[in-house]
Amino acid sequence: NSTMNSLLQLGR
């Protein structure tokens, strides 16, 4: 799911 991936990336 790319939406989840985007959020995880922001939290990197």
UniProtKB/Swiss-Prot annotation:
It comes from the Eukaryota. Nacreous layer of shell. This is Uncharacterized protein IMPP10.
